[in-house]
Every structure is written in structure tokens, then in C-alpha cells.
A protein has these predicted regions:
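Conserved alpha-helical "signature site"
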Residues: 1, 6, 95-351
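Bacterial c-di-GMP phosphodiesterase EAL domain
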Residues: 1-56, 210-211, 234, 252
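The catalytic core of metal-dependent phosphodiesterases that act on cyclic dinucleotides
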Residues: 30-138, 258-261
Length: 351
């Protein structure tokens, strides 16, 4: 029921996985919102508790994504209606996916999960999948450039000016070199839910209302918008998710003055993929606090554990997540809530 608090009914669809473990009819004690899709392994429908689960599903009729496994053929004869059918891209080759997509098309919308490379993504779509899910886009696919492009370099200059508390007129002069930067910055601030009583109209207005520290975190997002990579929107969404998740996970564990730095650490964690430039080169051009640089370079420091937990959340490894969360003293409920809040936050942003 906590899902409704952070992902209100009527918002974008969200998939909720039951994981590989078995589940039973008690799952339906939860009244899933209409925009929530429950991911369910086919084996659950023919397990010892399968008949009770089937009866509950037919009574409540939640939106389902049935994950195809060796028991799927039998599970599909149970009468349970599925909107989606999920296929693990690691288990099937291209020919198998084509055959399965054709055979199950009338039973549900085909989605490929655990897609590991851009080539695998293209293959899944060519095989007849309607959509594909994976984190393949977070890894740079080409050799890094030797330097930042002019647009990226100007954003770094603005960031350095804000971090050093430069005069507003000096920062405004830098912003005027690329009007799109000011536009994007104001759009981010006005859609980010600061709870402001008025719309921010200019950089000077933003400084007066928010202060340099808060502005610094939103300026950090502009580096990603300078990317021309077709995967940039997905990368930006993921960077925002990591940024907000790290901030939420650290709540009560670090001083509040460090929240913005944790946000920036997450936001910058995909700069190499977004900018096509090695992370070392980007950091050399910026004046970042040492804990941020250390975490991004994998050198440890007090932000490293929060970044590692954010990265673990993108892997289908419950044990790894549990171990990382336990190291920080976080319960499963705390982690799950922070994860959904971060996802909702990233989804609300406009790129």
C-alpha cells in the first residue's frame, strides 16, 4: 500500500516484480493500483499453492506480466489473463525469441528483460519484442573523446563559478553564451517540485529563492543535456534516479549539508556515458569536493557505499542489495520506499 504514497494511481505504469521466489494468494491481499503491473514467474501458477493464486488472480484481475520459464506452456492454460509476457534475453537466442514472440503474440505483449548490450537490444526488437528492458545503455559504447565540446566546457565553467560563489552578474554572463542552458535550468527547477509559491523566472530570481547550494545540484544536470547520444534521455533518467536515491538513502545517516553532494555524486555517475569523455577528464575540469571525486573514481570515501547501493539496485540480485543495505543499517522497507520515491522523482522530470 506504500506504493500509492510515492506513485499515485493515474501516473505512468510501474512494474512490480515478485522476484524469483514463490508467491501465493496472499499477494492479492494487496490492492494493486490500476497503473501497477505485477511481474510473476509462470512456475508460481503450477506450484502447490498455484490453484489458490489462480483463483485470487481471476477474482481480482490485476495487470500481470508473466515471465516465461520452462513451466510457461502449462501456466498459459490456467485461464489467467496476462497483459505482458516477459522473456529473459539471457536464456534465449535470436531464433528462439522469434519463435516465442510469434507463438505468444495473441496471449500478451512481448517484453525482453535483462538485455545486456545494444546489439542484444536491436536483436530483441528484430525478433518481434514490443519492448526491451536492461541497463546496457549505462556503459560507454565508443572510445572516449579527448576533450569536452564547447557546450559542455561552458556548463563546467558555470558550475565552477556557482561552486566558488562568484558574483551573479559573472554567472549570468556565462549563461548568456548559451541561452539554452538558462532555459533548461529554469525548466528543471520549475518541474522539480521545490514547493515554491511562484514560478522561477530568471537565474537571479533562482539565486534569491534557492541559494547557490541548491542551484549547484540542478546545474549539474545540465552537463547531461549537452549529450547528443540517442540514449541520453534514458541516461539522464537513470542519473537522476541514482542522484535522488543516494540522497534519500543517506537521510539521517549524514549531515544535511551533505545531501546536495550525494545528489551530485549520483547525477555525475554516468557522465562518461553521457558525454563520451573519460570521467577523469571531466573531474579534472571541475572543482568538486573530494568525497564526490573519490566515489566517482572508485577510490572509497564516505559516499562510496551509497553509490554502490544505488548501482546494486539496477541489478537483479536481491542478496547483493540486502548486504549493501545492511552495511548502512537500512531495512528492506526503507530501501524499497527510497527506490520508489527516487523513481517517481526521476520520472517527473522533463528532458
Amino acid at each position: 500500500d506504500g506504493l500509492t504514497d510515492v506513485w499515485p494511481p493515474g501516473e505512468k505504469p510501474v512494474f512490480i516484480s515478485c522476484g524469483p521466489a514463490s508467491c501465493d494468494a496472499s499477494l492479492l491481499d494487496w490492492s494493486a493500483p490500476q497503473n501497477a503491473t505485477i511481474e510473476l514467474a509462470a512456475a508460481n501458477l503450477i506450484s502447490e499453492q498455484g490453484s489458490d493464486l489462480i483463483a485470487a488472480l481471476q477474482t481480482w484481475q490485476p495487470t500481470l506480466c508473466l515471465h516465461f520459464d520452462p513451466q510457461a506452456t502449462q501456466a498459459m492454460t490456467t485461464g489467467v489473463q496476462c497483459r505482458f509476457i516477459g522473456f529473459d534475453a539471457r536464456r534465449f537466442n535470436l531464433a528462439q525469441l522469434k519463435l516465442l514472440a510469434a507463438r505468444t503474440r495473441s496471449l500478451g505483449i512481448g517484453i525482453a528483460f535483462n538485455v545486456e548490450t545494444a546489439a542484444d537490444f536491436r536483436a530483441c526488437m528484430e525478433a518481434g519484442m514490443t519492448a526491451a528492458s536492461g541497463w546496457f545503455f549505462t556503459s560507454p559504447t565508443s572510445a572516449p573523446a579527448k576533450a569536452l565540446n564547447p557546450g559542455q566546457a561552458n556548463i563546467v565553467r558555470v558550475l565552477n563559478l556557482v561552486r566558488s560563489n562568484a558574483e551573479i552578474r559573472e554567472i549570468e554572463a556565462a549563461l548568456k553564451q548559451d541561452i539554452a542552458i538558462s532555459y533548461k535550468l529554469l525548466r528543471y527547477i520549475n518541474t522539480a517540485g521545490f514547493g515554491l509559491s511562484c514560478e522561477i523566472q530568471s537565474f537571479r530570481h533562482a539565486v534569491n529563492m534557492l541559494g547557490y547550494d541548491k542551484l549547484n545540484r540542478w546545474l549539474s544536470l545540465l552537463l547531461g543535456t549537452a549529450s547528443k547520444d540517442p540514449m541520453a534521455p534514458a541516461l539522464m533518467h537513470t542519473a537522476l534516479f541514482r542522484a535522488r536515491l543516494m540522497e534519500l538513502l543517506a537521510s539521517g545517516l549524514v549531515d544535511k549539508s551533505e545531501y546536495d553532494n550525494l545528489f551530485i555524486t549520483g547525477a555525475f555517475s554516468l557522465l562518461d556515458a553521457l558525454l563520451g569523455v573519460g570521467i577523469e577528464q571531466v573531474l579534472d575540469a571541475m572543482r568538486l569536493p573530494e568525497p564526490i571525486s573519490d566515489a566517482l573514481l572508485g577510490n572509497g570515501g564516505r559516499y562510496q557505499a551509497f553509490l554502490e547501493l544505488a548501482l546494486a539496485s539496477e541489478k537483479n540480485d536481491g542478496q547483493m542489495i540486502a548486504e549493501q543495505a545492511a552495511m548502512l543499517g537500512l531495512t528492506a522497507a526503507q530501501f524499497n520506499r527510497a527506490q520508489m520515491q527516487a523513481l517517481s522523482f526521476a520520472d517527473a522530470m522533463e528532458f
